[in-house]
C-alpha cells in the first residue's frame, strides 16, 4: 500500500499531536497511509542552553534561527525520507497554497517541511536546501507549525483510502475550481426553515444539477476570481445565468 512520508523540522514538535492523534490525519497514520516524524533543531545543539537562534546581522528586532541546528536536523530527516524528498519552507514570502498545489504534493512519496520561528531562518539555509516556499495566506503567524499542519491535513485528504467515502475529496470546495454547495441533514424543518425540496426528491439528476448551480452561484458571489481562471461549460453558463436571474428577481 502506497504511503506518504512527511518529515517536519520544528522547535515545537508536540504541536503535531493534533495531526497524529485526531481526525482524518490520525486515521491515515494508523492505517499506514501517512508516516509523520518530527525533528527538533534543539536536539542538534551543543551548548548548554540549546541555542537555536541569534541576533540578526545589521540590527533590528527579533531573532533569527541559526543554520547549523537546522542543517543537522535536515540531515536526519533526509536519511529517513530519502534524498529525493522535496524540502518545503512554510513562509509568508512563499507562493500561496491552493488546491492545485495540494494535488501535486499528494503525488510525492516524501516531503520535508521546515517550520520557522522568530523573524525567520538564516537565508543561507534557504538558498542551500529549500526547494519550494509556500504560504497559506497574506498574514503573519508566530511560526510555521500551523501552516505545516494545514498543508499536511489538505494533502492527507487526497491520499487514497484516507477518507471514508471515495468521492468525498473530489466533492470538496476548490477540487473542481468551485466553492462547495450547501449541505443539509435532519430534521427537514428547523425553526421554520425547510431543506430544499429537490434534495428530498430522490431524483439524482436534479440533485446534481442543483448542487452544481449552487456551487457556481456561491463562487460567483464569494470568490468571483476563481471563475476567471475556469472555463465554464455550456451547462454551467446556463445554470449560473439562471442562478443570477433568480437571485435578482427574489
Curated annotation (Swiss-Prot):
Pfam families linked to this entry: tRNA_m1G_MT (PF01746)
Class of this enzyme: transferase
UniProt GO molecular function: tRNA (guanine(37)-N1)-methyltransferase activity
Keyword tRNA processing: yes
Keywords of this entry: Cytoplasm, Methyltransferase, S-adenosyl-L-methionine, Transferase, tRNA processing
Disulfide bonds, paired cysteine numbers: none
InterPro entries (UniProt xref): Alpha/beta_knot_MTases (IPR029028), tRNA_m1G_MeTrfase_C_sf (IPR023148), tRNA_m1G_MeTrfase_TrmD (IPR002649), tRNA_m1G_MTases_N (IPR029026), tRNA_MeTrfase_TRMD/TRM10 (IPR016009)
Subcellular location(s) of the protein: Cytoplasm
GO BP: tRNA N1-guanine methylation
Record's keyword annotation contains Cytoplasm: yes
Record's catalysed reaction(s): guanosine(37) in tRNA + S-adenosyl-L-methionine = N(1)-methylguanosine(37) in tRNA + S-adenosyl-L-homocysteine + H(+)
Function: Specifically methylates guanosine-37 in various tRNAs.
Subunit structure: Homodimer.
Protein family (similarity comment): Belongs to the RNA methyltransferase TrmD family.
Protein name: tRNA (guanine-N(1)-)-methyltransferase
Organism: Pseudomonas syringae pv. tomato (strain ATCC BAA-871 / DC3000)
Classification of source organism: Bacteria, Pseudomonadati, Pseudomonadota, Gammaproteobacteria, Pseudomonadales
Amino acid at each position: 500500500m502506497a504511503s506518504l512520508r512527511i518529515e517536519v523540522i520544528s522547535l515545537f514538535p508536540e504541536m503535531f499531536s493534533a495531526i497524529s492523534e485526531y481526525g482524518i490525519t490520525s486515521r491515515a497514520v494508523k492505517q499506514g497511509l501517512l508516516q509523520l516524524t518530527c525533528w527538533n533543531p534543539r536536539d542538534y545543539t551543543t551548548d548548554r542552553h540549546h541555542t537555536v537562534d541569534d541576533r540578526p546581522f545589521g540590527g533590528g528586532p527579533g531573532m533569527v534561527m541559526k543554520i547549523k541546528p537546522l542543517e543537522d536536523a535536515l540531515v536526519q530527516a533526509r536519511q529517513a525520507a530519502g534524498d529525493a524528498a522535496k524540502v518545503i519552507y512554510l513562509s509568508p514570502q512563499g507562493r500561496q497554497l491552493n488546491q492545485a498545489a495540494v494535488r501535486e504534493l499528494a503525488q510525492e512519496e516524501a516531503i520535508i517541511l521546515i517550520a520557522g520561528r522568530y523573524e525567520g531562518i538564516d537565508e543561507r539555509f534557504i538558498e542551500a536546501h529549500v526547494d519550494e516556499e509556500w504560504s497559506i495566506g497574506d498574514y503573519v503567524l508566530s511560526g510555521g507549525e500551523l501552516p505545516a499542519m494545514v498543508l499536511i491535513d489538505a494533502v492527507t485528504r487526497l491520499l487514497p483510502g484516507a477518507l471514508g467515502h471515495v468521492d468525498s475529496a473530489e466533492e470538496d470546495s476548490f477540487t473542481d475550481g468551485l466553492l462547495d454547495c450547501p449541505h443539509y441533514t435532519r430534521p427537514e424543518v428547523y425553526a421554520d426553515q425547510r431543506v430544499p425540496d429537490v434534495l428530498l426528491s430522490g431524483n439524482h439528476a436534479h440533485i446534481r444539477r442543483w448542487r452544481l448551480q449552487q456551487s457556481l452561484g456561491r463562487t460567483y458571489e464569494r470568490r468571483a476570481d476563481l471563475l476567471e481562471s475556469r472555463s465554464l461549460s455550456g451547462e454551467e453558463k446556463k445554470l449560473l445565468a439562471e442562478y443570477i436571474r433568480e437571485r435578482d428577481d427574489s
